[in-house]
Amino acid sequence: MFIDDTIAAIATAPGEGGIGILRISGEKALKVAEEIFKSMSGKSIEEYNKRTLIYGNIVDNENIIDEVLLAYMKGPNSYTGEDVIEINCHGGFISVKKILELILSKDVRLAEAGEFTKRAFLNGRIDLSQAEAVIDVIKAKTDIAHEVAQNQLEGSLSKKIRELRDKVTEILAHVEVAIDYPEEDIEHITYQTLKEKTDELKKDIKKLYDTAESGKILREGLKTVIVGKPNVGKSSLLNSILGENRAIVTDIPGTTRDVIEEFVNIKGIPLKIVDTAGIRDTDDIVEKIGVEKSKESFTSADLIVMVLDASRKLSEEDIEILEKLKDKQTIVLLNKNDLKQEIEEEKILKYVENNSIIKISALQQEGIEELQDKIESMVYKGSIKNNSSLVVTNSRHKDALSKAYKSATDALIALEQSMPFDFVEVDLKNIWDYLGYINGDTVTEDLLDNIFHNFCIGK
């Protein structure tokens, strides 16, 4: 990518719509716009106040392509930090396509995926963590996920990383004094000071790292698999949670023969709910495939919700499923609670904790609120819901923090063992670099390409 190129792209989704938006960014943006745009007043774009919507037409050799509104944002006070033109035309494939083709004919290049945001990063308007937050804002599935992403876009994570790197700089200053002036009698004081400050730094990194598990769920969703043998009420439960008849509900065992997936917002948690085929021995080829898919879904699940028929005693099939869930985060639902209870709860307690057993009636909508509260407490543990200002949601950030934490641990061990300060210096510089991966201070071009490749073309 050449930063001195002028680029353009369609910023809105393809298809029919009320408005289509095209974006131009770069040194020639204004010149190109002046060539193809004629305002209704006859004034040039520069004669208008910046950031003003100008009414006019896009023309090609005096032929009007479309009636538009145009905005000019002069760099560096724009999204990319460059001169930016945004054209609002009528939505629809033809108008937008013809305007883009006209723009590209003026020595303008089609933007690569995420190139507008990449330029914002390269021009210093935002750092890398803020750039990545743009995608999270777009893809947020709940209010809390959106709030977390918006806070990161506004710089909450950037600020924290700067604070941590400032602490590293301070500790490094002590180390470098000790290395440069070994004859000075400051060794004992320096070791003690460094141990205290490095331990504090290590705790700060760990505290931030610990938000990553819940953050990943907010960003990607909690994969929740509903399991149980046939006809215990799994599909009724799914319909109760979704509030619609998404799954087939009958008295015939094996009705759900495939894996049904839905996203639902549970108290701010994006749940990717997977309703599986009932697990049982069967000669039906199609149902057998569904059963195998159900078993496979166990391995990748973040949470298992097992449904049991409370009106019947535990069967061998029930126990076989419970055995598979021993090491999984599991909630057991005793369904059909409106009927006489026959199930033996004490046997279930061999496999799950008491507070993970909830009595419900999926058909009567009883116990659903308690299930939602339980999921909320398992995911958030109160931390994110009460403070969504600083949460690590990106796996790349989590990996960098993990490496920074290990280096902080190594530095602390070196100090506790009174090893030469040169060893400590190496560990501290590693911490500095790993934290820099997050905000983009220490990052390679290949990594940047990989990150922005996940963006859409017009962003």
From Swiss-Prot:
Keywords from the UniProt entry: Cytoplasm, GTP-binding, Hydrolase, Magnesium, Metal-binding, Nucleotide-binding, Potassium, tRNA processing
Positions contributing to K(+) binding: N231, T250, I252, T255
Pfam families xrefs: MMR_HSR1, MnmE_helical, TrmE_N
TrmE-type G domain location: 221-380
Highest taxon of source: Bacteria
Binding site for Mg(2+): S235, T256
Cofactor binding: number and manner: Binds 1 potassium ion per subunit.
Compartment annotation: Cytoplasm
Biological process terms in GO annotation: tRNA methylation; tRNA wobble uridine modification
Binding-site residues for GTP, renumbered to this chain: 231-236, 250-256, 275-278
A molecular function GO annotation: metal ion binding
Enzyme Commission identifier(s): 3.6.-.-
Sites where the protein binds (6S)-5-formyl-5,6,7,8-tetrahydrofolate: R23, E86, R125, K459
Needed co-factor(s): K(+)
CDD domains from the UniProt entry: trmE, TrmE_N
GO cellular component term, pick one: cytosol
Xref: PANTHER family: TRNA MODIFICATION GTPASE GTPBP3, TRNA MODIFICATION GTPASE GTPBP3, MITOCHONDRIAL
Function comment: Exhibits a very high intrinsic GTPase hydrolysis rate. Involved in the addition of a carboxymethylaminomethyl (cmnm) group at the wobble position (U34) of certain tRNAs, forming tRNA-cmnm(5)s(2)U34.
Subunit and interaction comment: Homodimer. Heterotetramer of two MnmE and two MnmG subunits.
Family: Belongs to the TRAFAC class TrmE-Era-EngA-EngB-Septin-like GTPase superfamily. TrmE GTPase family.
Record-given protein name: tRNA modification GTPase MnmE
Annotated source species: Clostridioides difficile (strain 630)
